[in-house]
Amino acid sequence: MAGTAAHEILEGLELDHIGILVKDLDSAVTTFRTLFGYRQATVPVVNTRQKVRVVFLEKEGSLPLKLFEAVEPNSALARAARSGGVLHHLAYYTDDLEGTIESLVSLGARVLSPPQPGEAFDDHPIAFLYVGSGMNVELVTTRDWRGRIRAAAPARTGTTAEPADAMDLERKVGGSDGI
């Protein structure tokens, strides 16, 4: 793909979220809620393909955060998280996943994970690429996250689950293994 055509496709990308690999998901959620005012937007979801447990946080006027922890203690992700949180990736929304991948590869990126259903995204396709300078990029094809608290919360006098209740909500609805 010619550089100009690749750049035209990439101009349409929109930064969607920041992915942070954490050592302990529950603790990290509490930290971001307490120190920075984020609210938990989803119940934790286990991504069986990538072997991580994921939760999204939101804050008015800020990009969403995707916090995730490794579920396999000896995985490369678990080893990377042992010293604490790590900026793992920037995620971009695209409506042309294949074209975006082709464009990025033509400009020197390397595919780490080809398109596959993203369990935290209601199985809409996602892909991961290494773009150089130690940075990974996730490409997402939907802005709808699985396990949104507003949709998953039990009825409670017309309100949604409070951020402090989100981890309890996961336990009450039987965990997040039913993916």
Predicted regions and their residues:
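A contiguous binding-surface segment within folded domains or other stable secondary-structure elements
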Residues: E60-A80
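Vicinal oxygen chelate
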Residues: A2-E11, E14-K23, R53-E58, L65, L77-S103, A127-Y130, ...
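Short Gly/Pro-enriched loop/turn and capping motifs at secondary-structure junctions
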Residues: E72, L97, G118
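Conserved active-site tyrosine of GNAT-family acetyltransferases
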Residues: A28-R33, L104
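A short, acidic/glycine-rich surface segment
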Residues: V43, N74-A78, D123, R148
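Acidic (E/D-rich), amphipathic helical modules within compact regulatory domains
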Residues: A28, R39-K59
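Short secondary-structure junctions
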Residues: F36-V46, L107-Q116
